[in-house]
Amino acid sequence: MATDVTETPAPLVDAAPEAPADAPAAPAADANAAKAKKATAPKKRASPTHLPYAEMVSEAITSLKERTGSSSYAIAKFVEDKHKAKLPPNFRKLLNVQLKKLVAGGKLTKVKNSYKLSSATKPNPKPKAAPKKPKTGAKKPKAAAKPKAKTPAKAKPATKPKPAAKPKAVVKPKTPAKPKAKPAAKAKPKTAGAKPKPLAKKAGRAKAAKTSAKDTPGKKAPAKKAAPSKKAATPVRKAPSRKAKK
């Protein structure tokens, strides 16, 4: 006889999820891509703080003022003394390279082992003289303006002649003429005082007056000239006195 066998089903077990095979390769690919970007990206150089080499070299040559030109050593020393803090450590190597470029570009001329500025790079002194002309033109109007200020000052003295009224003081000398007449008046009292003298003296005076009048006919003797007639009459006075003594 056949027996029935009952099969019991096996319990279901959850299968663990399989990890993707590409998972560990993904981060490695990202790292390689980042490195490639860094390699291709250009490095930014720090901008130099010093002046361009062309300017520094031309400044050194013009300041040194050497007839045969300045050597690379002299140029390097001058630039280092002036721009020492701003220069890179390999400055001398870069300077030699720049000197060769400047000679090739025609900005410098090499004579043996020295360098000179070419005629094209030398500064032209003519532009400096050009700005001087407007200065002189500006000064001329100033000189023209000065006489205008002086002319009113000159006109003021013309008004000053008003004190011409001062000549009134010149009229004062007329008053001294009056005292001249006073001495004549003083002389008259002397003649009045001579009246007590004898009549003989009066007759002598009259004769002397007549003789003086004859000597000067037609001329009227002024009052002042009467005084000398008295002096002429004095000898006549002495003559009668001598006769009286006899």
From Swiss-Prot:
Position of the signal peptide: none
Alphabetical keyword list: Chromosome, DNA-binding, Nucleus
Location of this chain's protein in the cell: Nucleus; Chromosome
Molecular function (Gene Ontology), one example: structural constituent of chromatin
Region (Disordered): 1-51, 105-246
Biased composition (Basic residues): 35-47, 129-189, 198-208
Record's GO cellular component terms: nucleosome; nucleus
Ranges where the H15 domain occurs: 49-119
Biased composition, class Low complexity, residue ranges: 9-34, 224-235
Biological process terms in GO annotation: chromosome condensation; negative regulation of DNA recombination; nucleosome assembly
Similarity field: Belongs to the histone H1/H5 family.
Function: Histones H1 are necessary for the condensation of nucleosome chains into higher-order structures.
Protein name according to UniProt: Histone H1
